[in-house]
Amino acid sequence: MHESAIVLAAFGVGHPRSLPGITKVVERVRQSFAPTPVRLAFTSQQIRRIWRSRLTRPLWVKEHPEVPSEVLMVRGPLATIADLHEEGFREIVVQSLHIYAGEEFEDLRSCLRGLASIQAVKPRWTPFRRLALGRPALGQPGIEHPYPQDLERAALALAPDLDQADEQGAALVYVGHGNPYYPSGVYQELEMVLRRTHPASLVAVGEVEGAFSLDYVRERLRQMGTQRVLLKPLMLVAGEHAHSDLAGEDAGSWRRTLESQGLKVECDLRGLGENPAWAEIYLENIRQAAASAGIAL
């Protein structure tokens, strides 16, 4: 029996149409690390409750055959790791599917630290031999994996999006989730890398929640002098933020606001998880986390 397993920890999403940003990554990881078991977990309790409530509605489940059972019955990282322990797995790599090392990632890291600290009186009963946490796509602070290199890697994965905008004669505007309580300056560092690696392209990176808001992006677009905008979520999935805050019909959405300024706006509502090159970032982070912890997958 395999004694190692992989847990993919995403924030989660509640709408079935947005699931490919997650399920495509899960599928890719399973293909790459077979026969190592791969489990999905959502860090958002609110999202988990949404799916759990749907389990009590058989008609809804029947009408949405595209939703995998592992999503309908999704659990949090702590419960998922506990389930694996009960099944006999003592070496686990938890890969964060978050974009950057923000609040959700720090909470996940704290959870793993707590589990790793458990020591039984008799060593053979210590729950886990090894626990490892794979860093987010845009890296994390520290010297083991310098995050500027992760930004370069991310920029390479995003190159097709800049090509798409260039073909349209448009400025590419990425919109991340952000966080009003946690630093998100890595978005602007990513923008700087994209501008340096694609000097002929017009690009800006904003966030729904945080300092680099729509006002920041509007000023950047004014400086560029562009008339066309390609708006894309810098998120694993194109969920509620993408469909409402970015592309919604409400007058306050990013699309409607930019259109009111005379700009022609196209929205490409595909999550980063649907980009094979972005999924490959997580695969590489899993390999590196496992190797650093001495876990064989």
Identify the role of each PLM range.
Residues 1-297:
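Active-site-proximal alpha-helix that buttresses catalytic centers in soluble enzyme cores
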